[in-house]
Structures are given as structure tokens and as C-alpha cells.
A protein has these predicted regions:
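PRPP-dependent phosphoribosyltransferase catalytic core
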Residues: 223-285
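Core catalytic lobe of class I
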Residues: 1-223, 272-285
Length: 285
């Protein structure tokens, strides 16, 4: 990181070790005392802030326990935008505490506002059995944006990477859908993306396939290199995701609604079509 020029990065995404006492082949100590972990985090965060352009976006993915304290540190140097809660679906028994059901994604910017901010829109949530809306939009149906509903700060549609078709390593890895959403929101084709904890290369491959320039850091690069040499599966997944965003209804939902007599003519429906083509073009750049 010290070798990179200051003010060169448009978007920085960091998924650091969570300090959970895990064993890594690199022999990194993942069981630091709390203050030691926070001091280490502040050192890399300060260096990362140096790299950001004015208006650049800074994302940190971590446990709420750590992001609560790191957020306070970041707020003294950057402008807070969002705390995004990312739902996790594991249901492990925990005694004496509420069940922790989300990861935290901190979003800060360098300066008063981001230079790039165009979040994806999402389809209306529908019943998978009948196609009916899960929420009542009342008399506002004809006023809704045909490209979908606004993205909120609770993301419950980010799946864990379990399917072997997409999973690239035995250890945990981030969903490509998460990075697709982050990069779409805070970068453009040609933007410079940096990830200081590359892992299996999810940020790298997302940036590559979405037409961003990128650089990253990782001690053990074998998984990321193998993934970048064969991006067919990741490209297929991104193309699938492109058909499911920036539309008011997914095609399958529209078909199910028609089959079960649900009216869609009150909405300004834009399902796939030209929007689908635009998204595919973006992925293939």
C-alpha cells in the first residue's frame, strides 16, 4: 500500500480478518487482543484513506462488533454515508445473547459527498407461489419507477457462496453479488478499484468483468490467480444477476402473475427488454 500514489483510488473495498481465532496458512495471528486488533486496523485504514481520491468511496465489511469502533475512527477522517446490514442465514445456537444475524458494511466517502453514486434498483418482492406483491403500494403503483424500487440499507438477498459451481476455495469467500452491487453503486467503467485483503479474488474478478481497473493485496494468491484465469462461471453468474436488477418485475414473476390473474397494468412495467440488453453489455465490457 505505501508504494501506491496518493489520491489514485476511486473505490476501496476491504474485507479484513475478523479476529476470530481462525488458523491461516500465512500464520497471521487472528486472535489479537481487542486493542491490538483495533490499532492494526487503524494503521491500514489510515494508509487506505491516503489512497482515496476526493469523492472516493471506502467500504469496510466486518462484524458489527468491530465496525462499531472502526466506524467511529473513520468518521473522524471521512464522511459517513451508510451502515448497511447484510443478512446472514446461519442459525447456530448461541447461549446468553441475541442471535447475530447480520454482517456490517460501512460506507464512507472522502469529502462531503461521493463523486459516483448510482445504486441499482431492485424488483418488487413477490410471492414465489402466486406472484402477488408482498407489500401494498396502494395508489402509488403508477408512480413507481419502472426500473424498480430504491435500494435500502438492509440487504437480505446476498446469498452465501455454497454452490460448488461458483465456490472457488474451501475457506469462506464473499458473494460476487455483493461486489457487483458495491461496484455498480460507487464506480463507473474505467474507475480504479483497490482491495487490500484480496482473499479468493471476488473483488478482482468483479472489477475485471465490470470494466473497472483494479489492484489488490493478498499474501496467498493461488486462488485468485486461478479464478482470474477462468472467469466463465463468474461471468455467467453476473449475467444472471444483470437480468434481476433495475427492473420492476423479474420475468418469471410477471409470468406467474399473469397465470394467477394479478394485474400488472397499473405499473409502468419494464421487464428485461432493453434494460436487460444494457446490463449484459456492461458485464461483457
Amino acid at each position: 500500500m505505501p508504494s501506491l500514489p496518493a489520491g489514485s483510488v476511486d473505490l476501496l473495498f476491504a474485507d479484513p480478518p475478523f479476529n476470530l481465532g481462525k488458523s491461516y496458512s500465512s500464520k497471521i495471528n487472528d486472535a489479537l487482543e481487542d486493542q491490538e486488533y483495533l490499532d492494526w486496523s487503524k494503521r491500514w485504514i489510515n494508509e487506505a484513506i491516503r489512497l482515496l481520491k476526493p469523492g472516493g468511496s471506502f467500504f469496510v465489511y466486518n462484524l458489527p462488533k468491530w465496525n462499531l469502533r472502526l466506524g467511529d475512527f473513520l468518521a473522524s477522517r471521512l464522511t459517513f454515508r451508510h451502515w448497511v446490514a447484510i443478512n446472514m442465514t446461519y442459525r447456530l445456537p448461541i447461549q446468553g445473547r441475541l442471535y447475530p444475524s447480520h454482517y456490517s458494511l460501512l460506507y464512507f466517502v472522502k469529502g462531503p459527498k461521493p463523486s459516483i453514486f448510482h445504486p441499482d434498483r431492485l424488483p418488487i418482492e413477490t410471492c414465489r407461489h402466486c406472484g402477488g406483491e408482498k407489500h401494498d403500494y396502494g395508489g402509488y403503483k403508477n408512480k413507481m419507477n419502472p426500473r424498480g424500487v430504491n435500494l435500502a440499507d438492509v440487504w437480505d438477498d446476498i446469498p452465501p457462496v455454497r454452490h460448488q459451481k461458483y465456490k472457488r476455495r474451501k475457506a469462506n469467500e464473499l458473494s460476487l453479488k455483493l461486489l457487483d452491487r458495491v461496484l455498480a453503486m460507487a464506480s463507473d467503467p474505467g474507475s480504479f478499484v483497490f482491495d487490500p485483503f484480496g482473499g479468493s479474488g471476488t473483488t478482482f474478478v468483479a472489477a475485471q468483468l465490470l470494466g473497472r481497473r483494479w489492484i489488490g493485496v493478498e499474501l496467498h494468491c493461488a486462488d485468485a490467480i486461478a479464478r482470474l484465469r477462468d472467469t466463465a462461471g463468474d461471468l455467467e453468474y453476473l449475467e444472471k444477476l444483470a437480468l434481476e436488477k433495475n427492473v420492476l418485475f423479474k420475468s418469471a414473476a410477471l409470468q406467474l402473475r399473469h397465470k394467477n390473474g394479478h394485474r400488472s397494468d397499473r405499473y409502468q412495467v419494464q421487464a428485461n427488454g432493453n434494460e436487460q440488453t444494457r446490463q449484459k453489455t456492461l458485464v461483457l465490457q
